[in-house]
Amino acid sequence: DFYEMYPEKFVNITNGVTPRRWLLDCNPLLAAFITKKIGKQWITQFQEIRNLASFANDFDSQKEFLEIKKKNKQALFECLQHTNPIRDSTGKPVGHYSFLDETALFDVQIKRIHEYKRQLMNLIHVIMLYHELQENPEARRIKRMVFIAGKAAPGYEVAKQIIQLSYCISRRINQDSKTNQKLKLVFIENYNVSKAETIIPAADLSEQISTAGTEASGTGNMKLAMNGALTIGTEDGANIEMHQQVTDRFWPFRFGKTTLENDLIRHTGNYNPWDIYMQNNSIRKALDSLRDQSFTQTEEEHQALSNLYQSLLHKQAGCIPDYYFVLGDLLDYYRTQKKVEELFLKPQEWAEYALQNIAAMGNFSSDESIKNYAKLVWDIQPCLVDPKELEKIRIEYSEHDKCRIFPSSVNGSIKNSS
């Protein structure tokens, strides 16, 4: 009915995030670097961030960016040492994580735990890397710290099993002296905005790996890119528009089938994950470890991991196996992760790509979203704000901002407690 009355108001407006919180506030070191390079106009006119591209190929700017990233990684270490204990199978804290150093790739997937977001694919890849390193500790030339964070809906059993799998894998691989100098996994518990504000500035790689055609948009991908993380992702949600802005040249880690390809597979029924399992030894070994008690200590854990194995390979309760094509995209994901490693071995080039990604994020500010709503939907014009009124609101907002749960740190990466 509303569409018949106002068809012109039914338009697609891209999501955005505020660069004041998700860059200026949460990453003061990077914000100061940007201001030094291009001035402070970007803070309120985020399209100005495009001017950072002219520094992307500058050696000194690349070096400074990489040093900032290392400092933010150290801030994340300090945060997790106090807020993220190692837990046993009953959930009891039994110690604290030891981390790889700041030269490691920080591989980050932070979002709601859901099958379509495919944390499970990320974890299977971690198992594959672990098996490779067990056979040959020199199989990988970079160090990788994998961080996963998110919450599961209260009644979503499979999502909770994915969290259990994360804990089981991290417990095993982090204690394996043969591999733990090259690979570690941390599940960050009780994920919230305050923790995101410390994780995001430290990220090197942003995992945006949902099954193409399932993500409406997403904003975590924008926050991570604004802070200089490169995206490994499918053509899904806002990844598509980000890819267009960044261009193919600086978006090297695209992988996976498209929405149209996935729709065709579902329509024809031409997908059998069992064939993939049988034809690839590395995948088969990784999946078999979900049911052979390689990672479990209790029967409850064994049952949870066995259920995940079954969901990927066997029809259950009328649902087709591997509904979100985890195995269907896994090999392409694995190959693309090798491209990640190759680029990470060239830090100056990696920094150039990261700075180009930041510079391309102008369209993904919430200011831009609001401007487009005002123009295309609300039909209202911008008006000047009284500076005194603005300052009053800023003070009131600061006084009532109760979301900060971490104490202040020297570099400002961990926020003040209110």
Go through each PLM region and give its residues.
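Short, conserved catalytic or adaptor-binding loops enriched in Gly and charged residues
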Residues: F2-M5, I173-N180, Q245-T247
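Structured aminoacyl-transfer and RNA-binding surfaces used for tRNA recognition/handling
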Residues: D1-F2, Y6-T14, R21, N27-I34, ...
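Long, K/E/R/D-enriched contiguous segments that form extended
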Residues: K70-E197, T211, K388, K392
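Catalytic binding pocket for nucleotide-activated donors in carbohydrate/polymer assembly enzymes
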Residues: Y6, T14-F55, P201-A202, I209-A354, ...
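Extended, charge-enriched "interface" segments that sit outside catalytic cores
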Residues: L23-F99
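Generic, well-ordered alpha-helical scaffold segments in large soluble proteins
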Residues: D1, G16, F33, K37, ...
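Acidic, low-complexity intrinsically disordered tails
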Residues: L384-S418
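Hydrophobic alpha-helical scaffolding
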Residues: R20, Q62-L66, Y116, G155-A159, ...
